[in-house]
Amino acid sequence: MAVPAFDGCRFQPGPTGSNQINQKGDLIPMSVVSMRELLEAGVHFGHQTRRWNPKMRRFIFTERGGIYIIDLQQTLQLLEEAHAFARNIAERGGSVLFVGTKKQSQGAVEVQAKRVNMPYVNHRWLGGLLTNWRTISDRIDRLHELRRLKDEGQLDLLPAKERISMLSELEKLDANLGGVADMKRQPDAVFIVDLKKEQLAVREARRLGLPVIALVDTNCDPDEADYVVPGNDDAIRSCDLIVRVIADGIEAGQQKATPADFTPAKNGAPPEEEAVAAEEPVEGAEAEPVAEPVAETKAEEVPAE
C-alpha cells in the first residue's frame, strides 16, 4: 500500500529526542517520538471510509484503497501536547489512570502503567469505578484481604468448597481491580485507548470532570477527549508506541517531582456527598458495551519506504 508523502517543508524526520531544523532554518523543539516511528508502527492507518465519524475529518490526511490515512503531522503535535500534560500531572504528584481493555492494548497498558506506578484497567471496566468510589474502595479492601489470607496460607485451612469459592472470588477481583488495587483516591486524569470501546470509562470521567487523554481512531468522537491523539487503535504496535510515549511523559514528570508532591491531600478522596450523588450503581453497570468488531480489512503492515 502506498504511503502518502509528507511535505518536507513542514517536517524533517529526525531521531527521537533530537532537535530538528526545517527548510526555513527554524529550530523545531525536541520531539517525544519521531515521524519514522509513527509510520513504522502504522499509526496513520484509520478505519475503512464507510466506518468513520465525520468529526474526525480534520485529522484525516487522505484516503487510500478505501482506508482513511491520518495526518501524522497533527498526530505528532497533539501527542507532544498530551505528553506534556501527562508530565505536568506527574510533576505535581498526580496520577493518571490507564484504560485499555481491547486485546491490542492490554499488554501495553499493563506494562507501561506498572513501569510508572500508575493505576490501570486492562481486563474490563467495572461500572462505577470512578463515580461510585466508596463501593469500589470496599471491593479493593476485600481484594487485599483475600490476598493476605492466601499469602498466609489461611485459605488452605478452609473446607474445600469454601476455599474454592474464595479463590474464585479472588481471581475475579484481581482481574477486575488488580490494576487499581493501590489507587487510594480518584485519578487526576484518565488515558484511554479507543473511546468507542471504553464508553463507560469516558462517561464516568466526563461526569466527574476528569481530563481525558485518548488515542482516537477515525471511527471515534474526538469531542469526548480533552487531549486527542489521532491514530490507529487497532494495531498492537501503534497502541504500544502511543501508550509508551504517554508513560514517558509521566516518568519525566516523576523525576522532577519532590517527595512532598506525592503526599495525598487531606481532601484527596472525593467527598461522600459527591460519591453518593454522582455514583453509578456498580452491579447495574456490570455489562460492558459491545466491542467494536475488528474484522474489517485494515492495513497494519510496515509501509514501504
Residue ranges and their predicted role:
Residues 104-105, 197-198, 235:
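Short phosphate-engaging motifs
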Residues 19-95, 101-102, 106-150, 160-165, ...:
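N-terminal cationic and glycine-rich segments that engage phosphates or anionic surfaces
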Residues 100-101, 193-194, 231, 238:
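Small/polar loops that bind or transfer phosphate-bearing groups
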Residues 1-30, 255-305:
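Intrinsically disordered, compositionally biased charged tails
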Residues 200-260, 264:
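Short glycine/threonine-rich loop/turn motifs
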Residues 42, 98, 190, 242:
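Residue-level signature of catalytic and energy-coupling elements of molecular machines
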